[in-house]
Amino acid sequence: MPELPEIEVLKRSLNRNIKLTKINKIKINNPNLRYKVPLSLNNTLKGQIIKNVSRISKYLIFNIKNEKKLLIHLGMSGTIHIIKKNKQNNTNGSFYNSRNLPKKHNHIVIDLNKNFKLIYNDPRRFGYIKLLNNNFINEKPFNRLGPEPFKSNFNFFYIKKYI
């Protein structure tokens, strides 16, 4: 299972590579993940710009220019691969740096401009992808999460208050 530091590194890698890229097409190869992938994903996000990628706990949140948000949770075995389209047989730009990405478990393929492709690969299918509304932070599971360890208010005094 990817742990919080891995998710943070992945978020930074995504921001470095795909920030301000346009979503050309989303191909859903298998919608049957932990929760069914909304089949409307392509129609909703096609042509939209990814403003940036943020992280809350182990959830990756793709902030889209039209104020939509795409949530990705990697589950137990999920990985995201950033691939330059003209270098598919070479090392890809993902955190995992796999040379040969097994196509069998590529459940979601997001075709981006700037010659990038984003692949969600998950052999166990425990991860999930969903669209969020703007008020998502007040809904489950976000309203039950603990403090963010990388925020400045998570310090000795915060911990002392709860001991």
Predicted regions and their residues:
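Extended, highly charged segments
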Residues: 1-70, 74, 83-92, 109-116, ...
